[in-house]
Amino acid sequence: MDLRFQRGPSGEWKASVVLAFAFKGEDIRKQAQALIDVAPWLDIAPALNDFTGAAGETGVLYGHPKIAIPRIILCGLGERESYTAETLRKSVAAAMQKCRELKLETVGIDVQTLAGLPGDAARNVEEAVVSAYLPLYTYERFRTTRKEPLFTPSWISLFFAEDIDSTLRDAARRGESAAAGIFLTRDLVNGPANLVTPSFLEEQARKLAARYGFTVRSMTRQEIAAAGMGAFESVFKGAVEDARLLAIEYCPRGMEKEQPLVFVGKGVTFDTGGISLKPSANMGDMKSDMGGAGAIFGLFETIGQMGGQAGAASAGFTRRVIGVMPCTENMPDGQATRPGDVVTSLSGQTIEIINTDAEGRLILCDAMTWAQREYDPAVMVDLATLTGACLIALGTDVAAVFATDDALADTVRTRGGDVGDLYWRLPLWDRYFEDLKSDVADMKNVGGREGGTINAALFLKQFVDEGRRWAHLDIAGPAYRNKKSPLCPFGATGFAVRTLMQLALHGVPEPSGD
């Protein structure tokens, strides 16, 4: 679906349908005056009186099929006092699903209406555009019985009554680019593990680099082992598929010596648990255990869509950004790591492996050490579908954030919340590390059942350089769902792509002495 812009008096607007937004209890005619100008029939449509404006309500109003705007979809926003950006997202998503159902070829939105909603005008436009795309996602690569693909409108257009406002146009482009990044993440995470292997992810990284001018580095399992990444090696020892350590870099001109913002994403393309084998029920969902790496791919697709190496700086991506992705399968095998084995990490610290199903932290700890040595990041953020305990604690809508300083934690929560990615901060209290102490090594890879998400974060903290700014995002809950939501038909959600995008665009303020 293409994004377009139309400029001129409302009488010149053309589309199969136009979306109109209305608050409950307010005069709909006043809220949709621009549309009444272009579609006078709307003012006298009897169905207009049936529309209440309740949150999530949609109503289709029909005019004459030969006129420029033959249909209006009314989108309810609920009470004005209760309005949030999430209200707008769900409203647009519901309307676009109705467009798919009715097979409406072209869709229009009056920008002035969006700009007049509560909140920042550019934010409203960006959220409306990204929300128009996300509910239309499909993954049908392996469907052979459907006679035709699900219908998708050919374009969506933003209507400007006067000159096109460059700020709002750029916001719309950000929304479009964010959707493209999320779609790539969803494709990778939804993809079956016999297709989406570590070597496949390397191919995808190189395609991004070739298309957008990024730089890619890759290490094979032999190189990873030779480098001394014993924790990472312990996970891939049982796998036939070759592991990879991938790094992809975006560096604006003149920023080559700048300390970068580094994201480290867990890329376990299939997780059986290893010798500590998972139950068979729902094991197929473990193809999603590379959601952290998938989000990094989505970020770089977004940067690429905004201009890539050559032009993204003019779109606001003025910081050097690097994504590091340790990628492997976790499989049981005669060569696989056993519970009770002791390995030496790249940092030199030794780890007693109590449970081979706590593998994500093992690949992340070596990748984090490597990233710090190679890139000396100003800020390092790791993200992973790391613990089931996080899902129990926070549910499917909220991710956990841990951070070494308040400014970093607050930035993740605020910037993520701005785009609908919700985070809740959990503590990094050293007292919890007692559960990770080992009698035979420097630490164990798991503690007891209690506080599992905190223990995992504290394990990773042992591999963060003194004074390094670091945040850990446990996205186990919101990264993958087995039920439909307004913005995601099924499976991978693309959670955290827009959080990373926000951090790359706006950076992280310095800590205030905490």
UniProtKB/Swiss-Prot annotation:
Cofactor note: Binds 2 manganese ions per subunit.
Highest taxon of source: Bacteria
Main subcellular localisation: cytoplasm
List of residues binding Mn(2+) 2: K266, D271, D289, E359
Binding site for Mn(2+) 1: D271, D357, E359
One term of GO molecular function: metalloaminopeptidase activity
This protein's GO CC annotations: cytoplasm
Catalytic activity entry: Release of an N-terminal amino acid, Xaa-|-Yaa-, in which Xaa is preferably Leu, but may be other amino acids including Pro although not Arg or Lys, and Yaa may be Pro. Amino acid amides and methyl esters are also readily hydrolyzed, but rates on arylamides are exceedingly low; Release of an N-terminal amino acid, preferentially leucine, but not glutamic or aspartic acids
Keywords: Aminopeptidase, Cytoplasm, Hydrolase, Manganese, Metal-binding, Protease
Pfam family, one: Peptidase_M17
EC identifiers of the protein: 3.4.11.1, 3.4.11.10
GO aspect biological process, one term: proteolysis
Cofactor: Mn(2+)
Class of enzymatic activity (EC top level): hydrolase
Active site per database record: K278, R361
Cell location: Cytoplasm
InterPro entries to which the protein is assigned, alphabetical: Leucine_aapep/pepB (IPR011356), Macro_dom-like (IPR043472), Peptidase_M17_C (IPR000819), Peptidase_M17_leu_NH2_pept (IPR023042), Peptidase_M17_N (IPR008283)
Known function: Presumably involved in the processing and regular turnover of intracellular proteins. Catalyzes the removal of unsubstituted N-terminal amino acids from various peptides.
Family: Belongs to the peptidase M17 family.
PANTHER family assigned: CYTOSOL AMINOPEPTIDASE, LEUCINE AMINOPEPTIDASE-RELATED
Record-given protein name: Probable cytosol aminopeptidase
Origin species: Oleidesulfovibrio alaskensis (strain ATCC BAA-1058 / DSM 17464 / G20) (Desulfovibrio alaskensis)
